[in-house]
Amino acid sequence: MKDQLQPGVSLALLTAYQVGGPAEWYLQPTKAEVLDEALGWARRSELPVTVIGAGTNLLISDVGIGGLVVHLRSWRGTQILEEGLIEVKAGESIAALAFQTARRGWAGLEWAVGVPGSIGGAVVMNAGAHGAQFSDTLESVEVLTETGERRRVAAGELGLTYRSSLLQQRDWVVLSARLRLAPGHQPARLIEHIDEFNTFRHRTQPSGFPNCGSVFRNPGGEKKAGWMLDRSGLKGQSVGAAQVAEQHANFILNRGGATARDILTLMTRMRDRVVADWGIALKPEVRFLGRGLNWAG
């Protein structure tokens, strides 16, 4: 295991925003025994452990992350347990899985085709789009607890709500997810739905610059976060090289050379403007990781 641990690995290019400093220690495991040994070493060394997947919903501090960063990008594999029931490792792409299951005629993940994250991140954040969310098809997850115990946890025990789960408060590593999909559908029809979702996404969301998707959660009710940010005149606002997208006000773009501090400052400005105009304090959809990067509110 020690020969796979790397000190001082830059995390910027491993995230959608392409900002952030180095990991004190970095590991990209592919085997269970390597992961178990590394987590045991971190416990004995009293080092904090941070787990990342596709890096699509993260803002990492400019000074980096202390302790051990476990990158599950290569933790891949899908097992068909029965018709419509699959076990998927945490590093698998949720968008790729949406295509694969649609081609089998299994419905339930079509909404996820444009979501650039991993299965593990989708579980932790209860990712969603187009009125659907990951919890709709999730049966259970396999986790590695802070004591090194492997445990199967039913979806009903995870506190899954809009863009939230109890996993965000636990020092557990999500290893895999068990999904129950609906077989018996026409693959061509499911692919047609996927194409419709893709067309909508390309029409309404910006591309061309690094971004992590929606910055703030929708607060509930009729007013969406993007709508309020738009009406508050925030499109095009910038801090350093971080800019609110002109196409969608709930996106922040890294136009080249932005820092995590730039993005955090811009997010704070956006939040404060919406509070002043609408009396609603938007909550981040982005997770903040690393030293010196704190969200006030």
From Swiss-Prot:
<keyword id="KW-0961">Cell wall biogenesis/degradation</keyword>
<dbReference type="GO" id="GO:0051301">
    <property type="term" value="P:cell division"/>
</dbReference>
<keyword id="KW-0521">NADP</keyword>
<dbReference type="InterPro" id="IPR016169">
    <property type="entry name" value="FAD-bd_PCMH_sub2"/>
</dbReference>
<comment type="pathway">
    <text>Cell wall biogenesis; peptidoglycan biosynthesis.</text>
</comment>
<dbReference type="GO" id="GO:0071949">
    <property type="term" value="F:FAD binding"/>
</dbReference>
<feature type="domain" description="FAD-binding PCMH-type">
    <location>
        <begin position="18"/>
        <end position="184"/>
    </location>
</feature>
<keyword id="KW-0963">Cytoplasm</keyword>
<dbReference type="GO" id="GO:0005829">
    <property type="term" value="C:cytosol"/>
</dbReference>
<dbReference type="InterPro" id="IPR036635">
    <property type="entry name" value="MurB_C_sf"/>
</dbReference>
<dbReference type="GO" id="GO:0050660">
    <property type="term" value="F:flavin adenine dinucleotide binding"/>
</dbReference>
<dbReference type="InterPro" id="IPR006094">
    <property type="entry name" value="Oxid_FAD_bind_N"/>
</dbReference>
<dbReference type="GO" id="GO:0071555">
    <property type="term" value="P:cell wall organization"/>
</dbReference>
<keyword id="KW-0132">Cell division</keyword>
<dbReference type="InterPro" id="IPR016167">
    <property type="entry name" value="FAD-bd_PCMH_sub1"/>
</dbReference>
<protein>
    <recommendedName>
        <fullName>UDP-N-acetylenolpyruvoylglucosamine reductase</fullName>
        <ecNumber>1.3.1.98</ecNumber>
    </recommendedName>
</protein>
<keyword id="KW-0133">Cell shape</keyword>
<keyword id="KW-0573">Peptidoglycan synthesis</keyword>
<dbReference type="GO" id="GO:0008360">
    <property type="term" value="P:regulation of cell shape"/>
</dbReference>
<feature type="active site" description="Proton donor">
    <location>
        <position position="214"/>
    </location>
</feature>
<dbReference type="InterPro" id="IPR036318">
    <property type="entry name" value="FAD-bd_PCMH-like_sf"/>
</dbReference>
<dbReference type="InterPro" id="IPR003170">
    <property type="entry name" value="MurB"/>
</dbReference>
<dbReference type="InterPro" id="IPR011601">
    <property type="entry name" value="MurB_C"/>
</dbReference>
<feature type="active site">
    <location>
        <position position="163"/>
    </location>
</feature>
<dbReference type="Pfam" id="PF01565">
    <property type="entry name" value="FAD_binding_4"/>
</dbReference>
<dbReference type="Pfam" id="PF02873">
    <property type="entry name" value="MurB_C"/>
</dbReference>
<comment type="function">
    <text>Cell wall formation.</text>
</comment>
<feature type="active site">
    <location>
        <position position="285"/>
    </location>
</feature>
<keyword id="KW-0274">FAD</keyword>
<keyword id="KW-0285">Flavoprotein</keyword>
<dbReference type="InterPro" id="IPR016166">
    <property type="entry name" value="FAD-bd_PCMH"/>
</dbReference>
<dbReference type="GO" id="GO:0009252">
    <property type="term" value="P:peptidoglycan biosynthetic process"/>
</dbReference>
<dbReference type="GO" id="GO:0008762">
    <property type="term" value="F:UDP-N-acetylmuramate dehydrogenase activity"/>
</dbReference>
<keyword id="KW-0560">Oxidoreductase</keyword>
<keyword id="KW-0131">Cell cycle</keyword>
